[in-house]
Amino acid sequence: MWSGIPVFALLSSIGIAAAENGLDGWLRYASVPCNGNCQRALPSHIVTLNSTKSSQVYVAGQELQDGLHQILGKHASVKSTGCSTDSSIVVGTVEAYRQVCNTGSQAPELDVDGFWLSIRGKSVQIVGQTERGALYGAYEYLSMLAQGNFSQVSYATSPHAPIRWVNQWDNMDGSIERGYGGPSIFFKDGVIPQDLSRVKQYARLLASVRINGIVVNNVNANASLLMPSNMDGLARIADVFRPYGIRVGISLNFASPSTLGNLSTYDPFDSSVIAWWGNVTDQLYARIPDMAGYLVKANSEGQPGPTTYNRTLADGANMFARALKPHGGVVMFRAFVYDHHISEDNWYNDRANAAVDFFKPLDGKFDDNVVVQIKYGPIDFQVREPASPLFANLYKTNTAIELQVTQEYLGQQSHLVYLPPLWQTILRFDLRVDQKPSPVRDIISGQRFDRPLGGWAAVVNVGTNTTWLGSHLAMSNLYAYGRLAWEPTLDSEDIVQDWIRLTFGLDRRVLDTLTQMSMESWPAYENYSGNLGIQTLTDILYTHYGPNPASQDGNGWGQWTRADHLSIGMDRTVKNGTKFSGQYPAEVAAMYENIETTPDNLMLWFHHVNYTQRLHSGKTVIQHFYDAHYDGAETAQTFVSRWESLRERIDAERYQHVLARLIYQAGHSIVWRDAINNFYRNLSGIADEKERVGYHPWRVEAEDMQLDGYVPYAVSPFETASNFTAIVTASNGTTGTASATLDFKTGTYDLGINYYDMYGGKSHWTVYLNDRVVGQWQGNSEDVLSHTPSIYLDGHSATRITFRDVKIHKGDRLKIVGEPDGVEPAPLDYAVVLPRGIVD
């Protein structure tokens, strides 16, 4: 039970704290208003039933002492003897509590890592089935206090599943694949650095949401991690995590016996290979006795694996499992295995089929300490996918779900997208195995098929940025992941409200505003990126960030839309298509097989239809595209004003940081909207019924302006420029000027400039009206925003700056002067003159 309901009403306005950089995350423990009564009602002593400084119970005592002082100014002493319940917090394991406190009935039975929390006046008992559970209970108690909740409670809670891990895709050189929060906190220049202070801070955050394992390196692993010096470094990392109840694991490169061990083979049946892995594993456990185990990506996207030697994936997984077995370790074996060279010319080819095709025949052949780690959908972390059918096809195999906190396809932390509502569409989905209730959450816990292991993994990818993920608001997803991994039936809105109170305080307006924005953010992003199950429509061949729908097709990666001038969507039916729908149990298969019973939000995932196909909503497919993209972009515009309403209620540093990203998102959502709508308007030849697509009366196209030092440039992909054309300076040493006489009636407008901010240069622009400077800016988004930059004029680099409340007279002369820098030729797309209340 997590409780965030305060005893007293949330204040309507609370004084702003000093500037904060986000490093403390939701553990900032800001002072809670208190008239002194709550302090007097709190315990004065903390009794930790273990005095060993490396123990989680000892750490729990330190966390309680520090938290009480920060939240309420309460100075509580800590001791490790006795069991007085008079004005004391007693924290320890069930075993220690029963022995020291001489009680056998008060603490209930708990599952592994579960805890019991009892608050009765000044007497608080926090009792864990393990030391880890006791630490979790301490964080729970502090979370209540930090949210102004001084309720008396008594309850026990245990985890949904034993495996609650995070994955980091950190590389040995310090870079992070799909990381948007700065360089690695674990690696630099091929080694583990001496300063691991950020690792300790990360450990606190993870433990506070009950994460119990971490894989610290990229699944596309570098064998050099297994060198003795780096094993020593891993041991130092493990030493930092251990007091917080988090076990360290590593990703392995399957070919390491060859690339690092100088063997002629990495065949999992070869005795020398088996011995090599056994020796490596023994060396690791000699340094890290509680190592969690291994994560393996094999035979996928160019990674080596057992099929090279005609061995099965189970053969490969079991080789590692047997090396780990004596030490109690686990193999997390990724189900992300597919051929990325298949031909779209074959109507029946389908990447979505791959996981079941590879793994279903192996059900029951994996050792009992192997867990198959399955992405939530059949493709790759898309904005909406059906639940992977593999969850329903492994009766005799341990499974875990793989989620992604890092927003690889979902805005890369430069767009606000609160992910739990997306995750819940998968976790709650009932696969109806054998016509029995089979929600995904019950399969991964091991409950549905009576499996001993199972659980959760999330790709997180924090970095050295003080916001951890590159955005303050993105931290809600990491917090929520931990909460759901413990109890997946929790409500997404309740979770984000707890996070808001812990992160931004108890102000009611802040709570209500951020709750609404968060809950609207995923539907908005889905609307302006890709809808009806068509996938995210991002550029899958480059950054995975901005729009490029054509990149989905015509290649072997298998994220196809099969869009042509008449029709769109993948036919995944058994009757006419790839037979993917038949991978589901009968009841679900029947629903997806028939267009009449397929939900609109997955229509194009399962069916290839004409653009004029009517949806259940009554709209045609193409009109739904047009409307959804306008709706989503319009919602994103409102995020800015809603956040601005909180200006006096949030510290200036975090306020400005978030505001810059929301302003950017508002502009980039229009780039998305126009790119997707223009692409499909051009492809289908079908006009928007509401006459919005391609009609922009408030714009002044840059190529139509009077140019001096600027020249027109045909942008590719074409749809990422208004009217398909931008302007660039004639050379990288030439200043460009674009001028136009404005023919809008006199009034006050918002003046927007759409431009391209490319990697490799920091151009400078100045905007004039009749030689009066309206504003100026530099193209430095690579220093400000978190997303992967682009060296091209495209949907990744396209962005907008807006100058508000500009007084414009009809006939005024608009002039934009661009000064190129580096490889960036001060590119411009258009200017837009917007009356108040108009979304271009």
UniProtKB/Swiss-Prot annotation:
Reaction(s) catalysed (UniProt annotation): an alpha-D-glucuronoside + H2O = D-glucuronate + an alcohol
Molecular function terms, GO-annotated: alpha-glucuronidase activity
EC number from the UniProt entry: 3.2.1.139
Gene3D superfamilies (UniProt xref): Alpha-glucuronidase, C-terminal domain (3.90.1330.10), Chitobiase/beta-hexosaminidase domain 2-like (3.30.379.10), Glycosidases (3.20.20.80)
GO cellular component, one term: extracellular region
Residues spanning the signal sequence: 1-19
Chain positions carrying an annotated carbohydrate: N50, N149, N222, N262, N279, N310, N465, N527, N576, N610, N682, N723, N732
UniProt-listed GO biological process terms: xylan catabolic process
Keywords: Carbohydrate metabolism, Glycoprotein, Glycosidase, Hydrolase, Polysaccharide degradation, Secreted, Signal, Xylan degradation
Entry superkingdom: Eukaryota
Compartments it resides in: Secreted
InterPro entries named among the record's database cross-references: A-glucoronidase_C_sf, Glyco_hydro_67_aGlcAse, Glyco_hydro_67_aGlcAse_N, Glyco_hydro_67_C, Glyco_hydro_67_cat, Glycoside_hydrolase_SF, Hex-like_dom2
Main enzyme class: hydrolase
Function according to Swiss-Prot or TrEMBL: Alpha-glucuronidase involved in the hydrolysis of xylan, a major structural heterogeneous polysaccharide found in plant biomass representing the second most abundant polysaccharide in the biosphere, after cellulose. Releases 4-O-methylglucuronic acid from xylan.
Family, similarity comment: Belongs to the glycosyl hydrolase 67 family.
Record-given protein name: Probable alpha-glucuronidase A
